[in-house]
Swiss-Prot record:
Organism: Mus musculus (Mouse)
Signal peptide residue numbers: 1-21
Protein name, entry field: Kappa-casein
Family: Belongs to the kappa-casein family.
Cellular component GO terms, alphabetical: extracellular region
Intracellular or extracellular location(s): Secreted
Biological process, per Gene Ontology: lactation
Amino acid sequence: MMRNFIVVVNILALTLPFLAAEIQNPDSNCRGEKNDIVYDEQRVLYTPVRSVLNFNQYEPNYYHYRPSLPATASPYMYYPLVVRLLLLRSPAPISKWQSMPNFPQSAGVPYAIPNPSFLAMPTNENQDNTAIPTIDPITPIVSTPVPTMESIVNTVANPEASTVSINTPETTTVPVSSTAA
């Protein structure tokens, strides 16, 4: 995939200048005359090739460029005189203070870090007797009664009153067998 991408980019890089030249001069093939490009001489600045090649931007920068300025010009410059004075002085006395680390320390009493629960280590006691739940295949299946509601429509014919259908719910128990194994 990456190789194909690099090949396509290289082909485009090689063909784009020719395509751009054809687009800028679309009817160059139609004319039989010579195309003379006239530059505005006031706008074109003459830059000798020697000065362009000697320019620092085109050279590899293997070391930092240090301008020759007086010592008071930059506070960040390396001064050999100061280093010589530091090397020639007597060594500093060994400090009685304990050297502090770079990171901040807790001010309180150190506490024990508890082991996380997901790193449960098995003990020797649990290896002898492994707990496997026993399932008896001969256990009878117990049916559990589940009450259900069914609506029964009773039509009562009363000669004294109008005929009205009465809905009365009636409960029945249906045995449901559970297949838990």
